[in-house]
């Protein structure tokens, strides 16, 4: 593992207790007595609060349901993995040899967990203000266009992030049928959650119909 002082420079924060940072970067695969799972648990809660606060202040006219969708689009594995990559966190992780050989340093799940753990460690040592300063700066670097229209464009992704976060399920899409001449064919798609139909839409392609069905489902969920 590389020198942690280099990581601290990337992070913009010097730990008083280096063992806390070591714990945050230690994956459970190492079988060490201390790994980053507990710090990840704490960091997850801290990031959920800070992103919610950030959105609340940034979007003063957006309703609660829409803020929940924005938060789900930012507080998730992919988003946190991107922020971890900005810090080159993968280079500093402590992994088992098996996980190392399996490409663990670039896995979204491992990077995301480590990012949350590091934020949890900073919270323990320096408090909420310091975590806010570091995490929101990173968030804006990775997502310079944090606005409702930009993040909601891909309704399928936004819906999946919301349903995973709130229900623990992933939407499925079922082709009901197609109709019309070949040069102007339309497709009807049903969207299901846990096997129950939530919405249905028609589009000029399967992809468009899926996006429309996801948009309808998002509107229903936020009510």
Swiss-Prot record:
The active site is at residues 44, 116. Its EC number is 3.1.26.3. The keyword rRNA processing applies. InterPro entries: dsRBD_dom (IPR014720), RNase_III (IPR011907), RNase_III_dom (IPR000999), RNase_III_sf (IPR036389). Gene3D superfamilies: 3.30.160.20, Ribonuclease III domain (1.10.1520.10). It is found in: Cytoplasm. This is Ribonuclease 3. It comes from Campylobacter concisus (strain 13826).
